[in-house]
Amino acid sequence: MERIRLRLKAYDHRVLDRSVASIVEAVKRTGSEIRGPVPLPTKKKRYTVLRSPHINKDSREQFEIRVHHRIIDIMSATPDTVDSLMKLDLAPEVDVEVMSMSK
């Protein structure tokens, strides 16, 4: 039995929350203990570009990208838990990072 940490990232928080819910449901079906999901601070990236390619430096446009993060800890992962996580079909825009941590 080992501890697994899942770190999920997405631009859309609704898609991220649906993916987190499906992961939590799959882990609970196998009987493993779970901690989370823990929402981490949203990172905001702002970009400012000139509207005109030639003149009018005062005329600018601002864009923002928000990256939402969640962490899920699976405290006692069994082989069934790992199999159920591998079979999950998550949204393609959700980035999942898996870290294995021994006790």
UniProtKB/Swiss-Prot annotation:
UniProt keyword list: Ribonucleoprotein, Ribosomal protein
Disulfide cross-links:
none
Pfam families named in the record: Ribosomal_S10
Q: Which PROSITE patterns match?
A: RIBOSOMAL_S10 (PS00361)
Q: Report the InterPro entries cross-referenced here.
A: Ribosomal_uS10 (IPR001848), Ribosomal_uS10_CS (IPR018268), Ribosomal_uS10_dom (IPR027486), Ribosomal_uS10_dom_sf (IPR036838)
Q: Pull one GO CC term from this UniProt entry.
A: ribonucleoprotein complex
A molecular-function term among this protein's GO annotations: tRNA binding
Please list the GO biological process terms of this entry: translation
User: Which family does the entry's similarity section mention?
Assistant: Belongs to the universal ribosomal protein uS10 family.
Q: What does this protein do?
A: Involved in the binding of tRNA to the ribosomes.
> What is the protein's quaternary organization?
Part of the 30S ribosomal subunit.
- Alphabetized NCBIfam families for the sequence: PRK00596.1, rpsJ_bact
HAMAP family in the record = Ribosomal_uS10 (MF_00508)
UniProt-recorded name of the protein? Small ribosomal subunit protein uS10
Output the lineage of the source organism: Bacteria, Pseudomonadati, Campylobacterota, Epsilonproteobacteria, Campylobacterales
